[in-house]
Amino acid sequence: MAATTTATSLFSSRLHFQNQNQGYGFPAKTPNSLQVNQIIDGRKMRNATVLSAASTDKAITTAQSVAPTACDRVRRHTISVFVGDESGIINRIAGVFARRGYNIESLAVGLNEDKALFTIVVLGTDKVLQQVVEQLNKLVNVIKVEDLSKEPHVERELMLIKLNADPSTRSEIMWLVDIFRAKIVDTSEQSLTIEVTGDPGKMVALTTNLEKFGIKEIARTGKIALRREKMGETAPFWRFSAASYPHLVKESSHETVAEKTKLALTGNGNASSGGDVYPVEPYNDFKPVLDAHWGMVYDEDSSGLRSHTLSLLVANVPGVLNLITGAISRRGYNIQSLAVGPAEKEGLSRITTVIPGTDENIDKLVRQLQKLIDLQEIQNITHMPFAERELMLIKVAADTSARRDVLDIAQVFRAKAIDVSDHTITLEVTGDLRKMSALQTQLEAYGICEVARTGRVALVRESGVDSTYLRGYSLPL
């Protein structure tokens, strides 16, 4: 009670002093204890209101700073990485994504004797992905890294799908195959193996329609892409093709083929560098970026060395590709081909790789890989009958005078034209290595601007027919 009286008297004195100083012209009144308590409660409420408003403003400011902007949205990016091939380069590039927690959705690797092209699909924001691109540029032998998602491009991927097919459902499956422009590559009494190419949306649509029949296995390549050429722009590839532009032959008739090739590859002829495969290379050998004979799988030699095809089923988690390729490279094995894509079960991915070695060494490698935690299944299908396919996108320099010839060659190899401009034609073709090599060799005379190729995907043939045993022998009449 004494404390309350003291506080009241002090408060009254302060109010009286303020009124005298302000000169209101009327005597100050001494408030009673009830009025003082009301004033104190009112000030507390005003202070609480001010604090609440300040907290609200701070919360709004914080929310505005935390709220993501349009450029911070997570989106799917298609990255092209062109490198000089060396031992362990796949593991090093996969490690850059694994250390930053990125999960690679698909990967397509076009390997050559001394160079390689990676087409990688990942999810991430623009800002963080830019940091990953900068880290990739710092790696040794990385020539160029490009995000193709920012410009118009044509993209394709390849899928082999094996599903149950009894006589009662086979007609409906064939109807769906015809709608999606797919192909039957193997058939048996109870199953069918289908090959289809297209964009990822087409793959998902076909898989959804075939799920009711029972999907047994799926092998998908990663997505590959090439930049679309704009109609009406000048031809930047004319020095690559004398056949495509015959009116230029007379102007440069005194130049030898080596001189014209050197002029084009040194960049004096307006060579393009906008695609994901580059037509020039600053080396003295003057070889195209992806040669026709890249990754050629040779038959078994006298020492027992041959190429082995491995099919791995792994968990779809960040870093699993780095784990697999690291286990292979640490043991001194070279990867000739690599294709990574979603498997038939959700949460799993299938890796198809080609590794040269003897049967004994590959068996040891398989036993070592089986010890990995994220590996669900591994199968060496080299000695089994299997259907293998690869996908290639090839951009050829061809104006109106040479376009008909290029399309005739494409028809022989059952290739499809998927993009046409004033000075180029982009073709899509699927098949084995020998078919790819033969087509690329035939088109070199017209000038190959860009090439993108996937690795090999393979599925075991349920029919048991191995076409390799028929080569070199005449078929029965």
Curated annotation (Swiss-Prot):
Q: Name one GO biological process term.
A: L-leucine metabolic process
SUPFAM superfamilies, per the entry: ACT-like
Q: Which InterPro entries match?
A: Acetalactate_synth_ssu (IPR004789), Acetolactate_synth/TF_NikR_C (IPR027271), Acetolactate_synth_ssu_C (IPR019455), ACT-like_dom_sf (IPR045865), ACT_dom (IPR002912), AHAS_ACT (IPR039557), AHAS_small-like_ACT (IPR054480)
Keywords for this protein:
Amino-acid biosynthesis, Branched-chain amino acid biosynthesis, Chloroplast, Peroxisome, Plastid, Repeat, Transit peptide
Q: Which residues form the ACT domain?
A: 78-150, 309-383
Q: What happens when the gene is disrupted?
A: No visible phenotype under normal growth conditions. The double mutants aip1 and aip3 exhibit a lethal phenotype; they fail to develop adult organs, are chlorotic and die.
Checking CDD domains in the record gives: ACT_AHAS (cd04878)
Annotated residues for binding of L-valine: D85, I89, I90, N103, I104, N316, V320, L321, N334, I335
**Subcellular localization, as worded in the UniProt entry:** Plastid, Chloroplast; Peroxisome
State the superkingdom.
Eukaryota
What does the record give as its pathway?
Amino-acid biosynthesis; L-isoleucine biosynthesis; L-isoleucine from 2-oxobutanoate: step 1/4; Amino-acid biosynthesis; L-valine biosynthesis; L-valine from pyruvate: step 1/4
* Translocase is among the record's keywords: no
Tissue-by-tissue expression: Expressed in roots in the vascular tissuem in cells around the quiescent center, in floral organs at the tips of young siliques and in the joint region between the silique and the pedicel. Barely detectable in mature leaves or siliques.
Q: What is its main location?
A: plastid
One GO MF term, please? acetolactate synthase regulator activity
Where does the transit peptide lie?
1-53
Which cellular components does GO assign to this protein?
chloroplast; peroxisome
Tell me which family the UniProt entry assigns to this protein: Belongs to the acetolactate synthase small subunit family.
Can you state the subunit structure given in the record?
The acetolactate synthase complex contains 4 homodimers of the large catalytic subunits, and 1 homotetramer of the small regulatory subunits.
State what this protein does. Regulatory subunit of acetohydroxy-acid synthase. Involved in the feed-back inhibition by branched-chain amino acids but not in herbicide tolerance. May play a role in valine and isoleucine-mediated feedback inhibition in roots. In vitro, inhibited by valine, but not leucine or isoleucine. Required for reproductive development and sodium homeostasis.
Supply the NCBIfam families for this chain: acolac_sm, PRK11895.1
Identify this protein by name: Acetolactate synthase small subunit 2, chloroplastic
